[in-house]
């Protein structure tokens, strides 16, 4: 399957008029694998709290989960910028480009927190 024919990993279908563009199937598989690993880490955290393990150890594991989520987030953002945003800005209407700029600003503000 060509990259252009794939669907984007973003939630483009949740907004009327938005079209998903592309995601590399290998990136999608990699992100899903990472998310499953994170899910396992979170289950481990639940067990640690349930078993009243030492707070510092729990906090170290929480930090590990947060970094893993940031890694997935960066990969999704990269894909969104390279495909969805690039297409909306270069080939979309002025309104679509403006909406994409607003969306990107919102995403940057959210990730900067």
Please identify what each model-predicted range represents:
Residues 1-113:
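Solvent-exposed interaction patches of small proteins and small membrane subunits
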